[in-house]
């Protein structure tokens, strides 16, 4: 902002004498400050976003209500922006958080690169075992091995696969590692017990993702770990019989070409089909 309201400027400048004068003049710390047309924050909220520990204590000591915030509960903001000392100040807010907000608390730790806050959250009842699956999958997807290892050690579900806005297809962490061609991560997850047979809602599993990415080394590694019958043509024919696929379609999926071109279309120029042996059935779930 080019200019800040007087109270916000005093907080950002850590101008204690100015704030004391404003308080003597009747400043109410529980009234939000309009920072722009669409943004307003509580005074304490500004201090938490700035991780200004002395200012946070000053405002609390002068009556700021820790339960008031415009963006989200201050425990979540502190988990992202501050250290354990500040997170502990708002730990009692755990009691009013929804399960989704508790999941977000672990995500805030990931976004803010504040793994040191996990212990405080756990002590407050926001355990990684119960609420850390979403953050674990995201950490794996972005290749953050250190955080993924920490969350797994704390009890995160290695096979967590609920859908969310980032992962609407409900993949597992190991499927995401395969999608990003992260062979070391895939190996590590499997060593830790990841289930490579769990498919997302479109039928993709780590092996099929590796094949789609033309990552032969990863595909070969995963294929060797899957049930042999999943890669047997006769077994696939048996599995697909209830679907009554036309014989010509089955033959086409065996021989290709699997890439269909639509050069005259404006929006969709091509589509790529699954090969016959990659077709997903409920038997392979």
Predicted regions and their residues:
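Ankyrin-repeat-protein effector appendages
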Residues: 123-131, 201-204, 208-276
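Ankyrin repeat domain, specifically the short helix-to-loop turn at the C-terminus of the second helix
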Residues: 21-28, 57-65, 88-96, 119-127, ...
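Conserved ankyrin/ankyrin-like repeat signature
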Residues: 18, 54-55, 85-86, 116-117, ...
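Ankyrin-repeat boundary/"N-cap" motif
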Residues: 1-9, 32-44, 68-76, 99-108, ...
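Conserved small/polar residues in nucleotide/adenosyl-binding loops
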Residues: 280-284
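A generic tandem-repeat structural signature
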Residues: 56-111
